[in-house]
Amino acid sequence: MRRVLVLAASLVLLACIGARPVEAQASTTRGFNVGIHFTGSTLKIEDGDNNNAGGGGLWFGYGFNRTVQLFLQFDGTQFDVNDAAVEGDWTMGHADLGVRFHFANSLRSWVPYLQVATTARVVSVQNGVVNDVAQADDVSLVGAGITLGGGILFYFNESFAADLQLAWTGGKFTRIEAGSVSYNDLNLDAQSARFNVGVSWWP
């Protein structure tokens, strides 16, 4: 009887030891992922000064495995620009389609990452002034660029994490629109940076 009890206790102990890695899993990066965040942004056009902005954004992703994730990210910010080709009250939007690379370990509750994306960048300007002439219509600048970024996820549990992200976008504004008038040969260098603080969830 004693041998049976010892054997049973040993089997229970082995089962507990075998189950520990599953129970200890602290993070996941696989499957569908959604997130929301606050955004702090800067924008610099040509040789002008940096202009600061605030706003928020949304994140949608799908992790094919522990490392590689395809994502779509939208960020919107609002700020004033006083020394650019178009002055006024600016609202800027970024739409990123890209790939994120996680340096993941499922037993660790923090996961750093790097990402790269192609970005559409659109600016709408209210109360616009072009060459010292006030515009009756809103003015829009449209362009594209490449975004490089990185960040770190801090997991509260296996599927819910705080997300800290820094992204930099370089590119050009190539089209300007004012009402029904459009000019497609614009060539304005523009750099923008975003610092995002939010949460991310794997349902």
Predicted regions and their residues:
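Short, solvent-exposed beta-strand-terminating loops
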Residues: G171
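Cleavable N-terminal export/targeting peptides
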Residues: M1-T29
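Solvent-exposed, glycine/polar-rich loop segments of beta-barrel outer-membrane systems
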Residues: V129-A136, E177-D185
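Internal, hydrophobic beta-strand segments that form the core of beta-sheet-rich folds
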Residues: L166-A167
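Gram-negative (and chloroplast) outer-membrane scaffold detector with strong preference
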Residues: T29, F38-G40, W59-I146, F154-E158, ...
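N-terminal targeting signals for Sec/Tat export/insertion, comprising classic cleavable signal peptides
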Residues: N33-W59
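Outer-membrane beta-barrel and related beta-rich outer-membrane complex signature
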Residues: G48, A84, Q126-G128, T174-A178
